Amino acid sequence: MNILNLKIIMFLLISNTIVVGGAWATSTCPDWPATRIAVEINALEQQLNKWSAAYHQQGHSPVTDDIYDQLQDKLRVWQSCRGLPDKTESQPIPGKGQFLHPVAHTGLKKLKDETALTRWMAGRKNLWVQPKVDGVAVTLVYHGGKLVQLLSRGNGVKGQNWTEKAPFISAIPQYIANAPALLTLQGELFLLMDGHQQAKSGGVNARSTVAGALMRKSPSPLLAQVGVFIWAWPDGPTTMKEKVALLQVMGFPFTAKYSEPVMSHLDVVQWRQFWFQAPLPFVTDGVVVRQEEEPAGRYWQATPGQWSMAWKYPPLQHIAEVKDIHFTLGRTGKGTVVLEVLPIKIDDKWIRRVNIGSVTRWKQWDIAPGDHITLALAGHGIPRLDNVVWRVHQRNTITAPNWDKFHQLSCFQRLPHGCEPQFLSRLIWLSGPGGLDIGGIGGGFWQELIHHELINDLVGWLLLTPEQIASIPGIGNARAEKIYQQFQRAKQQPFSRWLLALGFPQVVSVDAQWQVVLRRSLSEWATMAGIGQMRAKQIKHFLDHPDVQALADFLSTQKVVGFELTE
């Protein structure tokens, strides 16, 4: 394979996968008519604009940066599906304000991953990395060394006047000796923290806290806990080394302390990981890589510049798109709803399905195909639904099946009609770790037996011959013989495991026998440790059920441990 073909294949692989700060998600075009995708693009774009305006005008947003960035990535995918240009990076920063910035705030374009970082750094020199401080962006304007304006970022061109709050922020020098006649600085007002570790504590709502204090009409005591990190000095010294040294002399020490020269992408990777774990005096959400060489301030615009880039930390919340909704019937007759999502990789685990519980819970969530949800990994790596962050505009009606006739003692057989889902769930439980723990036997195998009508009740598999098992497509003679031997050995499993495999509501002692269990009265069960009156009734209903007794009779003929007839 030549190099050109290899590059093409790599491009195709990359173009069909998006990386969102450590979470991998497939990026396929939705199977929608052109009219619908246009409607959905417009709806998502409007919502993102509203959130962005709230962020820049009020210092907070109804959604986290993680969610916003991932939904913005989704918008790009949808736009590319229609051949529309990506306008997300060139759009003006939304916001409001009446006071003109001497130099526009450019904002930052975000790098998706290490590959994008390497590509951007190629051919550039004199690069530095800084923590991306999570706070409120401002402009500081000094005339003759005196602070004359403190402006919010606003829309990048105009901002609000917060100058009256500046005297209450001790981190902002009110006068700088030997300063240039006109000095314009851009930076971040942040909440001073004591050894904040981003990897452990996250954002702790620090930005909103600072924004709230700045927007109050009367000065807030919280302003005394606000620091400032200067990240831009338009038309300042040409080298970063001189720039940070002068900033420190002028009373802005954080820039010098947290600016590091980098030679390669590996240096950036190391600093990013270090600052993610290290105790810091501020909240961060990534790193910023910037080059010394930058245009004169008069050329800056309120759109991301090309001389600095942000590389954010892995998201704490991961978005998945709901592809379909499946209704499953468990072995006890309880229905559950499983969301099928476009595959997303969280940490080292690929997520494709998420169990969200009962139909009632699903209705409360109001989830439809196309909706976007946030997922997290709970105990044992099981995916958990956290929230619905975006609902599609066009919602297809989905009707849940009626499961009223199913219960704890229904469907020990494949028939009657409608029993197959619960029957399959019983078989999966029977062969699983909670039952007989038959290695390598799961839902796929049982489904094939049902499909080929080789099994009609919960224990009918004990009668199967190697030849019958081998008749299933994909199972050869050798594997069929192995499965047959596993089934025969299952007869020697402890009686207590057999009871659990059949669906018995409570563990009993291993040395019990079916006849002994059957003769116990309701009151005897109720007085046993850990059972009680309610569970005792469930046990008696189970033991007295004709289908269960038929299964026990069959197991007796098969000489299964504990079910043999005693004289």
Swiss-Prot record:
E.C. code: 6.5.1.2
Q: Which residues form the signal peptide?
A: none
Which superkingdom does the taxonomy of this entry point to?
Bacteria
The residues annotated as the active site are K132 (n6-amp-lysine intermediate)
Q: What class of enzyme is it?
A: ligase
The GO terms this record gives for MF are: DNA ligase (NAD+) activity
Keyword vocabulary terms for this entry: DNA damage, DNA repair, DNA replication, Ligase, NAD
Q: Which reaction does it catalyse?
A: NAD(+) + (deoxyribonucleotide)n-3'-hydroxyl + 5'-phospho-(deoxyribonucleotide)m = (deoxyribonucleotide)n+m + AMP + beta-nicotinamide D-nucleotide
One Pfam family for this entry, by name?
DNA_ligase_OB
Gene Ontology BP, a term: DNA replication
Q: Which cysteines are joined by disulfide bonds?
A: none
Q: Which InterPro entries match?
A: DNA_ligase_B (IPR020923), DNAligase_adenylation (IPR013839), DNAligase_N (IPR013840), NA-bd_OB-fold (IPR012340), NAD_dep_DNA_ligaseB (IPR050326), NAD_DNA_ligase_OB (IPR004150), RuvA_2-like (IPR010994)
Question: Which family does the similarity line name?
Answer: Belongs to the NAD-dependent DNA ligase family. LigB subfamily.
- Chain's role: Catalyzes the formation of phosphodiester linkages between 5'-phosphoryl and 3'-hydroxyl groups in double-stranded DNA using NAD as a coenzyme and as the energy source for the reaction.
Q: Which NCBIfam families match?
A: PRK08097.1
HAMAP family in UniProt: DNA_ligase_B
Return the protein name: DNA ligase B
